[in-house]
A protein has these predicted regions:
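A compositional/biophysical signature of low hydrophobicity enriched in polar/charged and small residues
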Residues: 1-160
Length: 160
């Protein structure tokens, strides 16, 4: 229950959380510290992306060339891909995936379509020799059509 309450509001004090859960403040502090060692990766905020100047939220799907993704080259290709991904500050999540004939995905944020287009061109230029196909879904963060903004509080609402 502590994690779900922290998903709703990670700024809540242990004292307020203890009152909400009906346990002592030292118990909450002890359990939270244990959860921070085992289950909580970090505390993060979810900003209003458009207010920070971001216009595009992109979900990018990648199909790796079959001959590259198998055999001896697999580790070096994977290492090269990971190194490239980690240098991209606008990519907020990436990993392997299954479905739609794609092998990997990444989620990126961009200040404008021109920024996205430049990033996409750099991706094709730097990683294109490893990729068969790239497909992107672009979400306009300023268009007024984001119905349910990204927020982790929804997970806690579904669990309680």
């Amino acid at each position: 229950r502590i994690i779900f309450e922290l998903l709703k509001n990670s700024k809540i004090s242990d004292r307020s959380l203890s009152k909400k859960l009906g346990v002592s403040q030292p118990t909450v502090t002890r359990r939270r510290m244990m959860l921070e060692r085992t289950s909580i990766d970090n505390y993060t905020l979810v900003p209003k992306w458009d207010q920070l100047g971001y216009e595009i939220f992109a979900i990018n799907f990648v199909k790796i060339k079959m001959e590259i993704a198998t055999g001896e080259k697999d580790k070096s290709v994977r290492d090269r891909g990971i190194k490239w991904l980690m240098k991209q500050p606008n990519i907020i999540m990436a990993g392997a995936s299954r479905g739609m004939g794609m092998d990997a995905f990444n989620i990126s944020l961009h200040k404008s379509y021109a920024d996205y287009d430049q990033w996409f061109g750099a991706f094709r230029s730097e990683m294109g020799d490893l990729v068969d196909d790239i497909q992107s879904v672009l979400v306009n963060l300023r268009g007024g059509e984001v119905i349910k903004p990204l927020n982790f509080k929804y997970i806690s609402e579904g669990a309680t």
